[in-house]
């Protein structure tokens, strides 16, 4: 399946993700080297923690122009969890922070969205297994994955105003965008590497792009 880069910028469980890539027949390389990112066939952008901190760390590596160039060249890239959130234009987590802007939309507090609603009692972070409802079943990452399949989430913020890239969502008081895409850019709010056979199937489909 050729080589998949996992971007190392000091954020995320990189080796768990690498193990999952290997499990579906891929060849992972964990790297922060621009030359490697330019040479591989596709890129995974992981991430955990706060948006602003992750965005600052990614920019400090000097990799953003490299990643932008690879996206513009048509190379498939997928953000995972916070890595997906970084694909959008901005986040309001602990102040306003600019994202990479490859997808339209912004990232907002899930707790704020639930406040004053009948679902205010739902726990935040949204942590655990939840089902997928399809907004666009033609997305190649959903091939062979039945609607209603469960995947694993851990997050306190979520994407909004992203209807043009929404492919699947999960119910949690609001419609939580779970899988987004635009051209060669993809994002999973859930962790495919923690989502059992369904997550591995989605990861395998990305590796076949």
Segments predicted by a language model, with ranges:
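Amide-donor transfer/coupling interface in amidating biosynthetic enzymes
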Residues: 72, 106-209
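Extreme N-terminal starter segment of soluble prokaryotic enzymes
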Residues: 1-5
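Divalent-cation-assisted or electrostatically stabilized phosphate/pyrophosphate-binding catalytic cores
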Residues: 17
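Alpha-helix C-terminal capping/helix-to-coil transition sites in glycosyltransferase folds
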Residues: 39-40, 73
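Structural signature of beta-strand start/N-cap positions in the alpha/beta core
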Residues: 27, 42, 76-78, 150
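Structural motif
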Residues: 44-46
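Cysteine-nucleophile active-site neighborhood
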Residues: 49-126
């Amino acid at each position: 399946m050729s080589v998949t880069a996992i971007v190392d910028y000091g954020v995320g469980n990189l080796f768990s993700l690498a193990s999952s890539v290997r499990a579906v027949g891929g060849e992972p390389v964990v790297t922060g080297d621009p030359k490697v990112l330019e040479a591989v066939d596709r890129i995974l952008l992981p991430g955990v923690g706060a948006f602003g901190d992750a965005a600052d760390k990614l920019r400090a590596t000097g990799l953003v122009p490299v990643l932008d160039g690879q996206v513009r060249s048509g190379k498939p890239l997928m953000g995972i969890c916070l890595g997906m959130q970084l694909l959008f234009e901005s986040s309001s987590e602990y102040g306003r922070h600019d994202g990479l802007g490859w997808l339209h939309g912004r990232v907002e507090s899930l707790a704020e969205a639930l406040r004053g609603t009948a679902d205010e009692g739902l726990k935040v972070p949204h942590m655990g297994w939840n089902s997928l409802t399809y907004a666009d079943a033609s997305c190649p990452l959903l091939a062979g994955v039945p609607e209603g399949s469960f995947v694993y989430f851990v997050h306190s913020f979520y994407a909004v105003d992203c209807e043009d890239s929404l492919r699947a969502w999960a119910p949690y008081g609001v419609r939580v965008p779970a899988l987004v895409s635009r051209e060669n850019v993809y994002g999973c709010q859930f962790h495919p590497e923690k989502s059992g056979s369904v997550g591995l199937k989605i990861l395998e489909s990305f590796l076949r792009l």
